[in-house]
């Protein structure tokens, strides 16, 4: 999840879970987008660290509960910024046609973009930058798991944004939609636990 103490993104899929990250001297609390009631993981983390030590709360937007959770946490704890995925990409992107890679081992080169799927992980090379997008362990066979997005090299040249958690197109297992941007372009990825993925380059 971290390389040399630098985290790009880590997002909990499990309901009620949360992850703490530090990146470029900022502290981020990333929640699952559920209902952040008193005593939930996000609130416990805030109480433990102290609100003055947290710079951002980031919550994927997947339900009305998520939106109400953002407002309550922000108002109660006076965090400097609480954002959802659509805050980052509300104007949207225009993408080319979908390209699919199935199975646990595949590789494709598309101009300066090189994608390798191996053991349910996706390695994305954009020139000097290399990023990994993957799921962590699924707890007890449930849908709860950890999506890990990290810059392996050239981390300062790339940006990874969680778009949504989705269960619609890959059976009962969750999939994740992620936008990755570097100096060579922008790509939207959809990744599942079983190694299937699609990507769309920005038009």
Range-by-range predicted roles:
Residues 4-203:
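Non-globular, low-confidence helical/coil segments that flank catalytic cores
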């Amino acid at each position: 999840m971290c390389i040399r103490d630098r985290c790009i993104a880590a997002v909990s899929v499990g309901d009620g879970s949360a992850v703490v990250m530090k990146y470029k001297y900022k502290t981020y609390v990333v929640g699952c987008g559920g209902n952040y009631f008193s005593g939930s993981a996000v609130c416990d983390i805030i109480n433990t660290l102290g609100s003055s030590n947290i710079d951002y709360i980031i919550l994927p937007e997947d339900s009305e509960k998520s939106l109400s959770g953002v407002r309550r946490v922000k108002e109660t704890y006076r965090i400097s910024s609480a954002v959802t995925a659509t805050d980052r990409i509300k104007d949207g992107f225009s993408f080319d046609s979908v390209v699919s890679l199935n199975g646990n081992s595949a590789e494709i080169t598309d101009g300066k973009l090189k994608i390798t799927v191996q053991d349910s992980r996706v390695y994305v090379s954009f020139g000097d930058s290399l990023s990994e997008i993957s799921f962590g362990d699924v707890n007890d066979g449930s849908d709860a798991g950890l999506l890990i997005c990290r810059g392996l090299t050239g981390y300062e040249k790339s940006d990874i944004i969680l778009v949504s958690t989705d269960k619609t197109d890959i059976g009962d297992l969750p999939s994740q939609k992620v936008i990755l941007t570097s100096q060579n372009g922008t790509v939207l990825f959809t990744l599942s636990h079983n190694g299937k993925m699609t990507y769309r380059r920005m038009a």
